[in-house]
Amino acid sequence: MPNIDLPTLEAFVHAIPQNYKGPGGAVAVVRNGEIVLRHAWGFADLAARKAMTPETRMPICSVSKQFTCAVLLDCIGEPEMLDSALAAYLDQFEDGRPAVRDLCNNQSGLRDYWALTVLCGAAPEGIFLPDQAQNLLRRLKTTHFAPGTHYSYCNGNFRILADLIEQHTGRSLADLLAERIFAPAAMKTAELIPDTALFNECTGYEGDTVRGFLPAINRIHWLGDAGICASLDDMIAWEQFIDRTRHDENGLYRRLSSPQTFADGAPAPYGFGLKFEETGGKRLTGHGGALRGWRCQRWHCADERISTIVMFNFEGNASDAALKMMNAALGIPPAKPVRAQANPGWFGSWLNPETGLVLSLEDAGGGRMKARFGTGPEKMDISGENEAQSSMTTLRRDGDMIHLARKDENLHLAMHRLKGEARQDIAGRYRSDELEADLLLVSEGGAIYGAFEGFLGKSDMYPLYAAGPDVWLLPVQRSMDAPSPGEWKLVFHRDAAGRITGVTVGCWLARGVEYKRL
């Protein structure tokens, strides 16, 4: 490729504080192992007036997952080495237990444990300890799809990996990371700090320019799925290590970033803690990270030996910034989608009865729709009267049915339009035997509210909103991890006499949790 258009790239970077508003951040571009751009702005702590620098450490959150998998490959070998240990760990399973490779590739079908903490009554700013993580993970008996058939993001996969690695080696993950990864990569200040409450070198902020920025409170203990704190310079060193070892057939990053498939042979979007993407015909590998008050993203294009890194101490869209930086470095112009006028027949709520997942669509203007299906809303371009797509999802409408496809997830669902009014007779207490947790629904002044209760406590009351007959939505916008699970979908079941017998509770991260009415 031709040389990077440095003025264009610099112009984008210097506009980041205006386009991604928040207290501070740090970004870098690396090509051929050399630093093209290294920039920090704003403040690491607004109250202390402590400036952000390339040496400022921040939590890299889920970017840690690739490093957990790197330790696995470097210290133990192929994932199959730990399959028997995983069978002992998930000893409550009757059948359909995932393999360790499924964990590495987010194909396990296990429900995300941070999402399940909500159902177990956790407070967003509560304390979450290692024994509580194992308590939750080791009680699991089912998956929400057959392992190896689909992709679903699951932090618990990597928490379990960390436990298995420590058990197998007899050493802490912190020591293994320091010795086998950080030292060879010259990541001089990178460190595993599992307890988020202990990190105080930089402050992460909730909020925005409308509500203001407030210091985020985090008191969770995580391991394997996240927990590494690193500076921009540490992350630059990682990219340089990747470039130095690119010709090594057994190089760590080459092994981490190798293509993966589903059980049916279809290409998978994820492997060994890395997300696979494409831009302008170029393959990218990388990962994002999030915790309340923090966002980060790294991308690497092996074909052109280019990497981009974005780290924010606020909840800005680091993934968007990192991809746009990559496109600028690659000389890829912004896409100009052709949009059609929205047909009102799109708008409303649509249910897939098999998974209990609900798709909600509303007009966003300018030939776009706002869709709610996964962890957060996504904007969809309407490309024809009955077709719409985003970077993740394709929709094809046929009357009162929408065919939803998420190719990367190997997921194809028939979504049926919800018509009619919801009955109000859902109040009561419901029990999940697998989670040993309750859902309490009450009616106050004609409005329905719900709360979760379990071994982690009793949650606040959340309002429910009707989506259609016997289908309700319960939004949860703050949880222990970030982003939050979003809308929980509640699909109620009735007997032949019309009495409520139970409810299926789920979201994209944790589908199909069955509750019976008490």
Swiss-Prot record:
Its EC number is 3.4.11.19. Belongs to the peptidase S12 family. One of its GO terms (biological process) is proteolysis. It holds the Pfam family DAP_B. Residues 373-392 are annotated as: Disordered. Inhibited by beta-lactam compounds such as 6-aminopenicillic acid, 7-aminocephalosporanic acid, benzylpenicillin and ampicillin. Inhibited by p-chloromercuribenzoate. It catalyses: Release of an N-terminal D-amino acid from a peptide, Xaa-|-Yaa-, in which Xaa is preferably D-Ala, D-Ser or D-Thr. D-amino acid amides and methyl esters also are hydrolyzed, as is glycine amide. The gene is dap. PANTHER family: BETA-LACTAMASE-RELATED DOMAIN-CONTAINING PROTEIN (PTHR46825:SF9), D-ALANYL-D-ALANINE-CARBOXYPEPTIDASE/ENDOPEPTIDASE AMPH (PTHR46825). Signal peptide: none annotated. Hydrolyzes N-terminal residues in D-amino acid-containing peptides. One of its GO terms (molecular function) is aminopeptidase activity. Substrate binds at residue 481. Residues 477-487 are annotated as: Important for specificity. It is an enzyme of class 3 (hydrolase). It comes from Brucella melitensis biotype 1 (strain ATCC 23456 / CCUG 17765 / NCTC 10094 / 16M). HAMAP family: D_aminopeptidase. The active site is at residues 62, 65. Keywords: Aminopeptidase, Hydrolase, Protease. This is D-aminopeptidase. Homodimer.
